[in-house]
């Protein structure tokens, strides 16, 4: 079933609001490479509870960053596993938004910040947990 433009816009606003929050985070090592960035984002991600999850679910987010490690503009969901139900997709969109909130203002090195500022970056989150029997 297709979602209305209003539903999509509302979810985008939720993602934007959560991702721009200045939530405190644990001290992290400076991020100097794309591999470091991916590891930092994955460390912030907590998949939905098992009862709301789907084994193998994938969700890809398109985002860009400022030089200082803050998100630039609002991130967009560009892919979600097709076989998931709308409730499962929603649970994963919320989990990704919360991950971006937890990762608000990443500690980029000056060189890395200069290199990636304003550039599009995609990150795919994969739920590789196994569903209990």
Where do the language-model regions lie?
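Charged, well-structured alpha/beta interaction segments
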Residues: 48-54
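N-terminal signal peptide c-region/cleavage motif recognized by signal peptidases
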Residues: 19-22
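Bacterial N-terminal signal peptides that target proteins for export
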Residues: 1-10
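Conserved "boundary/linchpin" sites in short secondary-structure elements
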Residues: 25, 39-46, 62, 66-83, ...
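Domain-scale selection of a single, long terminal region
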Residues: 10-13, 69
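N-terminal targeting leaders that direct proteins to extracytoplasmic destinations
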Residues: 1, 14-17
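Soluble non-cytosolic domains of exported or imported proteins
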Residues: 28-35, 86-94
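Short, small/polar residue-rich loop motifs at catalytic or cofactor-binding pockets
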Residues: 55-60
């Amino acid at each position: 079933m297709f979602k209305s433009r209003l539903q999509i816009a509302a979810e985008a606003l939720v993602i934007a609001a959560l991702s721009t929050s200045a939530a405190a985070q644990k001290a992290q090592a400076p991020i100097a490479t794309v591999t470091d960035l991916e590891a930092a984002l994955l460390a912030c991600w907590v998949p939905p509870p098992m009862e709301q999850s789907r084994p193998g679910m994938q969700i890809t987010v398109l985002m860009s960053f400022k030089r200082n490690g803050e998100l630039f503009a609002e991130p967009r969901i560009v892919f979600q596993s097709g076989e998931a139900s709308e409730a499962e997709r929603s649970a994963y969109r919320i989990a990704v938004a919360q991950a971006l909130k937890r990762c608000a203002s990443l500690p980029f090195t000056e060189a890395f910040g200069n290199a990636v500022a304003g550039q599009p970056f995609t990150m795919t989150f994969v739920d590789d947990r196994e569903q209990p029997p």
